[in-house]
């Protein structure tokens, strides 16, 4: 089922008697053609408890650079694998993903568990720009707020100065974090947005 798909390894973190250890939870494959998508869905993975996990949590907890950024800037919570990959490529190692645009109680409990090991000042919800992402961001914010998390939702309509130009809205062609260039993401970080 993963043949000819772009594969992401999903890892978790578990405690053993000697500290935190990474654990491979599954492999998820993204369809690369419409035929694949129609046959087996856009994403296919071996069974795992997705509702209990946060993608890229292992880096947040075990990688010193990611840990430092998480302590300083907080968590950037996105929808998916490609969003995390683009943010990390741009140097934002404090990115994680819900693997969707909603959050389960199990994922909230996972964030509580992460917060007990890594202090972070806030969570920035950087979900997709589409209606599902915007609605999801508001619902996720509400649920996280009720669990004591300081949460900010990324404002897709904000004015930003890219390349020293006059501030203007983020182009409509950018629909999610993965659509941004490395330079655009780095500009947002320099402006203190995340």
Residue ranges: model-predicted function:
Residues 1-119, 137:
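Phosphate-handling DNA/RNA-contact segment within nucleic-acid enzymes
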Residues 35-37, 72-73, 81-194:
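TOPRIM fold recognition
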């Amino acid at each position: 089922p993963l043949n000819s798909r772009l594969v992401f390894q999903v890892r978790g973190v578990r405690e053993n008697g000697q500290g935190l250890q990474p654990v491979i939870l599954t492999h998820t494959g993204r369809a690369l053609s419409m035929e694949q998508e129609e046959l087996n869905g856009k994403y296919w993975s071996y069974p795992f408890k997705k509702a209990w996990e946060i993608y890229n949590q292992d880096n947040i907890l075990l990688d010193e650079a990611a840990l430092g950024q998480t302590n300083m800037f907080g968590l950037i919570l996105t929808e998916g694998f490609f969003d995390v990959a683009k943010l990390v490529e741009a140097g934002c190692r404090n990115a994680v993903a819900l693997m969707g645009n909603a959050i389960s109680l199990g994922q909230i409990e996972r964030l509580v568990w992460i917060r007990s090991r890594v202090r972070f000042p806030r969570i920035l919800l950087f979900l997709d720009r589409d209606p599902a992402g915007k609605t999801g961001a508001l619902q996720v914010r509400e649920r996280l707020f009720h669990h004591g998390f300081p949460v900010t939702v990324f404002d897709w309509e904000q004015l930003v100065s890219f390349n020293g130009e006059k501030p203007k809205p983020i182009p409509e062609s950018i629909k999610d974090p993965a659509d941004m260039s490395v330079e655009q993401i780095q500009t947002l970080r320099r402006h203190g947005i995340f």
